[in-house]
Amino acid sequence: MAVQHMRIVLSAYLTNGQVNDAAEYLRGLGVSTGPYSVAPQPSPKAAVNLEIGNIEAAEFAEHGNEQWNHFEAAVGQCLSRFGEWLATVPTQNMDRLREAGWKVWSIANLWIDQDQMDFHLPPVLSAQLGRLELELYVLSNE
């Protein structure tokens, strides 16, 4: 597998240039953040990032030759749980956030060690991104 590290967030910012209030954004989502937490904002106008997952392949080195299978399974579980959590967000809440000027999307940052990356979305995540009309940006170091 070429992916060494994956970080995924649900990101949001106000398009009108106002201060991005994390508490206001979370109230707008209208659901418990569950296992997720808000990453520190470097400045008040920086995007609000709800940390969904941050997984390193090196965490699974103790599995020897099975390291990549365990890493891939952990990434898949993380993405599936994210989809299941998104299923709890009512579409009208996301619509209201947009009407209030919030731009909401998801970002997957991948660190890869070669010129290919093996990355796929579980159906539950694809379905929920579509239902909520959320874009997914996949960024990498290559």
Regions found by a protein language model. Name each.
Residues 1-140:
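Acidic (Asp/Glu-rich) sequence patches and key acidic residues
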